[in-house]
Regions:
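Residue-level detector of beta-strand structural context in well-folded domains
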Residues: 4, 39-40
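A general secondary-structure signal for short beta-strands and their flanking turns/coil
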Residues: 1, 11, 37, 60-62
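Intrinsically disordered, low-complexity regulatory regions of eukaryotic proteins
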Residues: 13, 36-38, 44
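N-terminal acidic leader/helix
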Residues: 2-31
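A short, sequence-level motif marking secondary-structure junctions
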Residues: 22, 31-37, 54-59
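Short amphipathic alpha-helical surface micro-motifs
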Residues: 23-25, 32-34, 44-49
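Short, compact, well-ordered microdomains
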Residues: 41-73
Length: 73
């Protein structure tokens, strides 16, 4: 598992930053994106998929979380 930062870019797109690899990618899909549940699988623009344990409510961004890589780019 890796520590990642999830935030909005200046263009208003959701992005995931992985400091360990100095990688920042746009999040193209998120499994749960409701007010009462947020997280799950995050699909990145480069094809990689990460899993963030779902939160019981939508967090205030930016946020640092633990994420597990499910699929490499």
């Amino acid at each position: 598992m890796a520590n990642v930062m999830i935030q909005y870019t200046e263009q208003g797109e959701l992005s995931l930053y992985l400091a360990k690899k100095d990688l920042e990618e746009i999040v193209t899909a998120i499994e749960f994106d409701q007010e009462d549940k947020w997280g799950g699988e995050l699909v990145l623009a480069n094809g990689a998929v990460y899993f963030v344990e779902p939160y019981p409510s939508k967090p205030k961004l930016p946020i640092s979380v633990r994420a597990r890589r499910l699929q490499a780019a």
